[in-house]
Amino acid sequence: MSIVTFTLTDPSSALIAEIMQAIERHNVSVPEGLRDISKPTKKKQQSQPQQLSRASARPQQLQPGPSGYQAKKPAKQKAEVVKPKQKQLAPPINKKAAKAKLYGLEQHCPKYAEAKGLQKQIGMTYYKISEPYALPDFKVMEASEDLVAVSEKDPMGSFEKRLYSMGFPKRPIKNVVPVFEFSDHYIVVFFPGSNAEIVKNVPKDSVSDYAEAQLAALLAARQQINQIHELGDILPTNYLNVLDSGTQDVVVSDEEDDSDSAQ
């Protein structure tokens, strides 16, 4: 019996199979060592660490679905464009104030004409310095020796006569007593912008409209008005400043259209 010895260096599986078949054909059992070599060896796969993307690295929220809880896909983030805030200019209190400034008119009652909550204004408080109470060609008249007193029987009529007797021009006097309407009260001002300015507060629940508020205020101010004797005391102070003296008779006219000065 002859013994064959051979050495295989890194044999392929096909070569081993042929050797085993040749041995079996001669009715010889295959050595165990050769059988072990013939078994396929599995190469260990080295697991490489999986690199996570930025999206998968974020924690995913689970949301219920038909087959259980599923990972919620991250929502696409939109780039938010932030617009710079524009500086907002404070609007004028009312249109009358803006128009008055446009034409260079004076405000003789700003405390109430520009007050917060003002709903309506009756009677003008904006006028040129040369035209007190918006009366063009304003001319001081000669005062009477006997001044008419404001009476309770005819308060508005006697008030008008009182002004005329003091030397006030015989013109409408509605701008001498402007009324400012607020939510729950009226503010009535006599001789706005003058040294003798009188202010009366009339609750709305005591009168039906601004005319009654004006009348109620006149009755309340009747004694104060009767104590005024000089015309200069009821004229706007800025008008008196353009005169050489408060008693000089001066006629001041303006060639510009006075329609913008009237209410």
UniProtKB/Swiss-Prot annotation:
Organism of derivation: Citrus leprosis virus C (isolate Citrus sinesis/Brazil/Cordeiropolis/2003)
Region of interest called Disordered, as start-end residue ranges on this chain: 30-93
Composition skew (Basic and acidic residues), residue ranges: 30-39
Protein name stated in the entry: P29
Chain intervals with Polar residues compositional bias: 52-64
